[in-house]
């Protein structure tokens, strides 16, 4: 499953050497076309609806709509089915990749707003994070750039800013990925979470994040 945004879309470009991938996602976009044509996406090893690309809707170009039109490999289902965490979990080795606007030092994820300004809905992020966590061999992943606005703002933040909401709670978050590394927060203490997240923040912001963490007794 890939959520909406530049990061999930970019992941598709690096899957060209994989084999026997399957798709169960609320949404699919243009990236699947090339992967199907290369034989990367076959869905043959899926444990739920093998041979089918399962989704609720598509978002992309005319080429994508031509691809799905009368395509027997496409299985469109309502979100009550695709996004049900227990349904998601029936897919063995389910990997859910979703993005975020910011992640605080305790592991809380905000994906829809910056302060009081809303940029989008949060879609099926929580559903797929929980479903992948329940899946045998599954991996729930939050992926984001470490900075925004040309490197002037850290996306690993001391705390979710005022007015913003928590999309995925610290209790649900497992893997967090930036260009500086990968950490697994599941089952970690607040001290461990703060240390791990500071390590994948942009180096320019690590010192101030550490100062905050010490002042607020995270470290």
Segment roles from a protein language model:
Residues 1-219:
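Conserved phosphate- and dinucleotide-binding cores of soluble alpha/beta proteins
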């Amino acid at each position: 499953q890939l959520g909406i945004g530049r990061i999930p879309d970019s992941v598709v470009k690096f899957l060209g050497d994989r084999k026997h991938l399957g798709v169960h996602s609320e949404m699919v976009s243009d990236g699947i076309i090339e992967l199907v044509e290369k034989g990367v996406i076959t869905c043959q090893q899926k444990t739920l609806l093998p041979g089918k690309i399962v989704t609720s809707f598509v978002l992309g170009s005319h080429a994508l709509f031509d691809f799905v039109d009368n395509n027997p490999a496409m299985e469109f289902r309502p979100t009550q089915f695709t996004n049900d965490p227990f349904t998601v979990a029936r897919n063995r080795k389910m990997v859910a990749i979703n993005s975020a606007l910011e992640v605080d030092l305790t592991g809380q994820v905000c994906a829809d707003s910056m302060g009081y300004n809303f940029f989008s809905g949060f879609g099926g992020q929580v559903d797929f994070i929980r479903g992948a966590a329940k899946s045998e061999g599954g991996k729930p992943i939050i992926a984001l750039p470490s900075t925004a606005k040309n490197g002037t703002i850290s996306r690993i933040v001391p705390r979710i800013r005022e007015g913003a909401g928590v999309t995925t709670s610290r209790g649900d978050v497992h893997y967090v990925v930036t260009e500086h590394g990968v950490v697994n927060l599941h089952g970690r203490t607040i001290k461990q979470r703060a240390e791990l997240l500071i390590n994948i923040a942009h180096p320019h912001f690590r010192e101030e994040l550490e100062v905050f963490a010490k002042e607020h007794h995270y470290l």
